[in-house]
């Protein structure tokens, strides 16, 4: 019985501590309409699991906030997109997460949908590295 209890506690600890919300490296596709192609860049963003629960009984007095792994702090970096027309603005600014936490998704600055386009989506056919 003690082995079963230890195993249960170990699984809880692993779920909470080991799969936490943390910075991770990702590759995103960036595009400028004036340039008509995409390039991929490496950046950091937040990924992982946050403890959350969904009650069976919906209490109107309790806020309905599901915590998600999101950025706590971020900076912006700028890259020049090659191959743009001379009159076009070839600079593209993108966010880089520097610190993560489990919190409410801010829909003013983040795509909080279940099925977003994804970081590698490119609306143009040509992708350059």
Curated annotation (Swiss-Prot):
Changing residue 78 to E: Increased activation of the follicle-stimulating hormone signaling pathway. GO terms for biological process: female gamete generation; female pregnancy; follicle-stimulating hormone signaling pathway; G protein-coupled receptor signaling pathway; positive regulation of bone resorption; positive regulation of cell migration; positive regulation of cell population proliferation; positive regulation of gene expression. Disulfide bonds join 21-69, 35-84, 38-122, 46-100, 50-102, 105-112. GO terms for cellular component: cytoplasm; extracellular region; extracellular space; follicle-stimulating hormone complex. Residues 1-18 form the signal peptide. Glycans are attached at residues 25, 42. It is found in: Secreted. GO terms for molecular function: follicle-stimulating hormone activity. Keywords: Disease variant, Disulfide bond, Glycoprotein, Hormone, Hypogonadotropic hypogonadism, Pharmaceutical, Secreted, Signal. It is linked to Hypogonadotropic hypogonadism 24 with or without anosmia: A form of hypogonadotropic hypogonadism, a group of disorders characterized by absent or incomplete sexual maturation by the age of 18 years, in conjunction with low levels of circulating gonadotropins and testosterone and no other abnormalities of the hypothalamic-pituitary axis. HH24 is characterized by primary amenorrhea in women, oligo or azoospermia with low to normal testosterone levels in men, and infertility. Heterodimer. The active follitropin is a heterodimer composed of an alpha chain/CGA shared with other hormones and a unique beta chain/FSHB shown here. PANTHER family: FOLLITROPIN SUBUNIT BETA, GLYCOPROTEIN HORMONE BETA CHAIN. Together with the alpha chain CGA constitutes follitropin, the follicle-stimulating hormone, and provides its biological specificity to the hormone heterodimer. Binds FSHR, a G protein-coupled receptor, on target cells to activate downstream signaling pathways. Follitropin is involved in follicle development and spermatogenesis in reproductive organs. Belongs to the glycoprotein hormones subunit beta family. This is Follitropin subunit beta. It comes from Homo sapiens.
